[in-house]
Amino acid sequence: MLTEYKYLYETHMHTSNSSACGSNTGVEMAKAAKEKGYAGIFITDHNWYGNNCINPNLEWKEWVHQFCEGYRLAKAWGDENDFDVFFGYEAGYNGTEFLIYGVDEKWLVSHKEIKDASVEEQYRLIHEAGGMVIHAHPYREEDYIPEVRLFPEYVDGVEAINATHSNKLSKSHNNPNFDTLAIKYGKKYSFPMTAGSDVHSTTLFGGGVAFKTKLNSVKDYCERILSKRDYALTNGEYTITIEELENKQLSN
């Protein structure tokens, strides 16, 4: 880690409270992240059309309440232990996924239309709420992803580094070229670029976005990313500043 970027945040994390693929609860993930040296985490569980474990037959308000449980309990633990826990979620569209930041449980309850929103409508709704849409691992290839689909007009940025693709601790999705292609995509459209580990258990990779100063809120995170202000990205093994990444020459 570049020493001046000492506040590291995990921006892509799942819990067993809401994600069917999660192995540990939000509280367990928060504890592990604090022990790992993170300044904070964003819990981004899979939403209603992603790999979710909440009963789909629940009334919307109750569904959202249960969906946010991993975050809510982790946040309570974080508040008691001087550790930042922020809310986000990963929206699924038949394998294509987006990281959503800047809305909360109250917003979700009052905007049921987000449930069946198209990618375009999602972008509009999240923007109206002051939030941010990041295309997660846009070039990942897996059985659950029928095809690579890009929506440059309906995202604010791209997850350029996903630690599951390259960190030696990762047991799935191992292909650094997924990140190389994502970086090229981000550079082509001059998108803000982020990094995250996409972790599902307390075996943490150490990936994420690092800043010189602590984040004040999710809004603060969105503003820093969207303005491409001074920050660094890491997969847990190597670290690069956003300025260096934007200027990095990649082979064809």
Please place each PLM-identified region on the residue numbering.
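Short, solvent-exposed loop/turn segments at secondary-structure boundaries
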Residues: S19-N24, N55, S110-E113, S170-H173
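An N-terminally biased module of ancient metal coordination in phosphate/nucleic-acid-related enzymes
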Residues: M1-Y93, S201-T203
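Flexible loop residues that form catalytic
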Residues: H46, P138, A163
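Conserved beta-strand positions in the central sheet of alpha/beta enzyme cores
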Residues: F42-I43, I134-H135, E159
